[in-house]
């Protein structure tokens, strides 16, 4: 036969303190699912940028790139100032939004703009200094490959390649230099 609870007050107090301690530890050290090395691989691109055509050094746009949702999302807001990416017949210049997220295995970008529609890209860093994303499905019968390279001076070079769908025959389509907007 077991003794009534009142006869084991020390055990009851010990169990209560242990339970409170476990609960306090859980409350003090919450898990941040997006604070991993992989989730920081695109941090070099976060900032306010002036965007220049690498060939002419002409200012062609502005891009605001920021982290959202506890650092889980990298969001891009691009506004072009020139006709560099204007689609024929469209009365206004390119503006668009990119939402980037590391999914545990690779980076995904969902891009939508006022010219070309929507593109979904996927990829990872390559060679230790460049982020490389490729379109998952063709857009207008073309594949797209984007490469962001961080430079020692703090600038970022964005190379854009296109290829006929499924061919892997990449041609340089755009070469942009991102410089901090001061």
Where are these regions (language model features)?
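Bacterial N-terminal signal peptides that target proteins for export
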Residues: 2-11
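Bacterial N-terminal signal peptides
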Residues: 12-21
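Hydrophobic small-molecule pocket/channel-lining residues, especially in calycin-type beta-barrels
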Residues: 26-182
